[in-house]
Amino acid sequence: MAQRGFLSAELGQYLLLISLLSLLVVPLARYGNQLLSAWHIERAVHRLIDKSQQHYAKSVLMSRCLTQTRLSMQVLGEVAQQNGVTYDVSYRQSGVPRTPPSAIVVSVTLDQSMKGLINRFQADVIQGATLQFYAPLRFTLPDFQQLNIETGCIR
């Protein structure tokens, strides 16, 4: 059987396959990169929450007072800006004086190149490019009889 035309059917199939792959690789790579970036940010948020819990427990042991106000990235020994993401951590104070903080707040601000990731997170508050994650502060005092209610400190 004589071949007619410039391209054989097999060569046409290969060209079609290569062109489809070249069209799909770029979006798939971009999607994979976004998933990887979101995973790194989630890991960083969980690490900051864990470090904040440990810092609070250590601060209570050192100061013997449940009321703690000082929490920041510098106190935790973490870098605030990493790969286009700015992190901030603080305590969420309840309105009652001389009581422990009610939660840990981790704020994540994404720069312009990372704004496409905002919908990939389940943040408690989303304001523009800033995501806020709340985590309850888990700390139990073994013996509440030794707590001075007037000062919020352990006797």
Q: Language-model segments: which ranges?
A:
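Short, surface-exposed interaction loops/tails
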Residues: 102-155
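Hydrophobic beta-strand residues in large extracellular and virion-surface proteins
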Residues: 48, 52, 87-91, 104-108
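Short amphipathic beta-strand and strand-loop transition segments with alternating hydrophobic
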Residues: 85-99
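Short, glycine/small-hydrophobic-rich surface segments
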Residues: 52-81
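Cysteine-centric signal of extracytoplasmic or virion-exposed proteins
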Residues: 64-70, 97-100, 149-154
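N-terminal alpha-helical signal peptides/signal-anchor transmembrane segments
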Residues: 28-32, 41-63
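N-terminal single-pass transmembrane signal-anchor helix
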Residues: 1-37, 41
